[in-house]
Amino acid sequence: MPPVEVDGWSRRIRVKTNAVGWAMSMVNASVEVDMTRHLSFSFPLYYSAVNYFRRDLKFRTFAVQPEFRWHFTRPEGLFVGAHFGTAYFNFATEGAWRYQTGYGNRPLFGGGLAAGYRKPLFRHHPAWEVEFSLGAGVYDVRYDRFYNEKNGPKEGTCHTTFIGIDNAGVTFSYSFRTGRRRGR
């Protein structure tokens, strides 16, 4: 039995990846599940263990940013979302310092709001989609600062509140209809 469609809508699961993350050498994947016609839940993961060609230039991270989304029409079109985010990081920018998650084990955490637009990538293959999104949030950040040299000693521990853009996406996805199929 095929999935039930109501007014042209059926529940879908999307498998996604963000091109902006890949441009930053961050492996990423996401799953989004339609909960109702207008509400969905997205769960992205980001990971990077990269030194950018040099020991003193790196952006290592592990982050998750689950988000509930409200779609104004169908899951295609305009949406807004509320998200929670947490991440571990270790980065250096060729300067005097290297920054690492506080105490090596306390992630940053916070949340924010996002908006975006999703549309089919191909007219004849609507399961392939592209979405454009931008989000901003507030995060509590505790980090350790080290001298940016081999085995550089710790200089101190800092605390700040980050307020700003916390995600940008050009995301490609493939969607699967959900539903039970019974054998004959």
Residue map of PLM features:
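Transmembrane beta-strand segments that form the barrel wall of outer-membrane beta-barrel proteins
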Residues: 9-24, 40-53
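N-terminal targeting leaders of membrane proteins
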Residues: 1-16, 184
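Outer-membrane beta-barrel "beta-signal"
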Residues: 1, 71, 162-184
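Residues that define the transmembrane beta-barrel architecture of outer-membrane proteins
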Residues: 11-13, 23-27, 58-64, 105-111, ...
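Extracytoplasmic loops and strand-loop junctions of Gram-negative outer membrane beta-barrel proteins
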Residues: 11-14, 49-50, 95-100, 151-157
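Outer-membrane beta-barrel pore domains and translocons
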Residues: 20-22, 46-48, 83-87, 133-139, ...
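Gram-negative (and chloroplast) outer-membrane scaffold detector with strong preference
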Residues: 33-132
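C-terminal beta-signal and adjacent terminal beta-strands/loops
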Residues: 138-148
